[in-house]
UniProtKB/Swiss-Prot annotation:
GO molecular function, one term: arginine-tRNA ligase activity
Major subcellular location class: cytoplasm
Database matches in HAMAP family: Arg_tRNA_synth (MF_00123)
Any one of the GO CC terms: cytoplasm
Protein name: Arginine--tRNA ligase
Pfam families (UniProt xref): Arg_tRNA_synt_N, DALR_1, tRNA-synt_1d
Family: Belongs to the class-I aminoacyl-tRNA synthetase family.
Localisation per UniProt entry: Cytoplasm
Reactions it catalyzes: tRNA(Arg) + L-arginine + ATP = L-arginyl-tRNA(Arg) + AMP + diphosphate
Motif ('HIGH' region): 122-132
Quaternary structure and interacting proteins, as annotated: Monomer.
Keywords: Aminoacyl-tRNA synthetase, ATP-binding, Cytoplasm, Ligase, Nucleotide-binding, Protein biosynthesis
Enzyme Commission number(s) of this protein: 6.1.1.19
Organism: Francisella tularensis subsp. mediasiatica (strain FSC147)
Amino acid sequence: MNIENYLSETLAKVFQKLGYVESFAKVVTSTREDVGHFQCNGAMPLAKFAKKPPLAIAEEIVEHIDAEDIFAKLEVAKPGFINITLAPKFLADTTNRFLNSNKFGVQNNLPNRKVVLDFGGPNVAKPMHVGHIRSALLGDALQRIHRFCGDTVVSDVHLGDWGTQMGMLIEEIKLQSPQLVYFDENYTGEYPTESPVTVQELAEIYPRASKRCKSDINEMEKARLATFELQQGRRGYVALWQHFVRISIDAVKKDFDSLDVHFDLWLGESDANKFIDEMISYFQANNFIYEDEGAWVIDTNKDGVPPLIVIKKDGGVMYGTTDLATLWQRSKDLDPDEIIYVVDKRQSLHFKQVFSVAERTKVVSEKCKLKHVAFGTVNGKDGRPFKTREGGVMHLADLISQAKEYAKNRMPDENDDSIIDQIAMATIKFGDLINNYANDYFFDLEKFAQHEGKTGPYLLYTVVRAKSILRKIFGDNYDIKSLAKDYKVVNAHNEYEEKLQLQLIQFPIAVQRAYENSQPHHICEYAYSLANSFNKFYVNCPINNLDDESLKKARIALCMATVKAMTIASDLIGISIPERM
């Protein structure tokens, strides 16, 4: 139950009764703790339509609200705010209801939808680096949130395995080892099962090949021709390319596993290749595509969005072509209600072109919503894209090692590597996901690793503190679900209990905002606020030495609720919580 929605529906009945438009009855969490828990600001915009002062409208609404079981206090403030304070029993009962529900008050979406999430997107032959974490972590959080809310999710890594960089690699290896059978057009036998290069060698070859092609137009033409021949199915090139893909996937899977990020599909641009001819024929048959200076293009029919080149002059395909073919494939195979791309905002124009063409040509069905979650860049303290101290790109494996080092330095007596791993992951993931994805942000691992402030380790420390209370009382193998039947939250005895209860029942609000806006930072902000509320409760509300048994059990119930809410929230952003720290 989203408490904001519940209160809005309660007020909407009064608005309707008084002849006011119900949509103005929206209730939101109060921006000022000193005036109430929630507020309704609808009287101000409503005044224009009702031809009455907003203060008079607000007072009229409050006079007609009859819900003493929900509201302890309803106050009107100039120019027309309605400040709402919940009844203590309603607040406690709602907290109990959430504690005893599987998803802490969150209800499944109805009807359930099928959502395809395209994220990760590493390129073949390139090791994953710090710049990849935004797509990986943001996409993983979104798939967790969508599944939690009841959607059927299909996640696809969508490898970059079919562009000009493949031709560059082929030509560079041919230059180094022309004797390899992959380059003999007359060879008809079986190709070797072992790759002629390792993934480490591939990572060294690509920069060299790229530099050569950028400095020599003839070398670039060779790479383009090799790419074209690969895409046309030249046997030796296909066999060599398959080695590139296999060893690259093995490497990036290890990187993703280290982040606890997993995919349902491991497809790439190449998997859409077999659909391109079918799709082009469809475009031609329906007069969507036309020739322009030797290339084949499709208009987007949108101002400011240029036509999309589908086939180049040389017959090769563009990234937009494979992206369209991927949409074609997904529509046929999966028939999704929504496809979400988690990709750098620098690709925004590209996706506007692809989405416009896909919708105009009916490549996707009318029910299918296309969305680009366009995230900002990861920058260092200098405001530039994050680099190592030596000025190079930091590989993901090195970043994780550094995070573990920070965790170990702060806990030198901790010998459990799994706990160090959990702290390191919380450091990286929370440090990234606390930011609104649309913004660039400064990646400061030293700051993210602090055990105080808005950090992952601070969240872990708080939950471990709450868990330790329960462990001292119930032992190591306690089960919150069964215990909650006998431990109930009661009306708050002080402001610390009240604020903790109030924070606990706002969990579904955070989840809904994260779900609807593809913004996991709402979950992070919620978890941080809950951690703060619990720590104040912990300091000011003793448990173990209480003589009042009913109060003691009520506070234990609040500890249970905190552990449950924090555990679910942390899991939604891919963070696991240790038992001890």
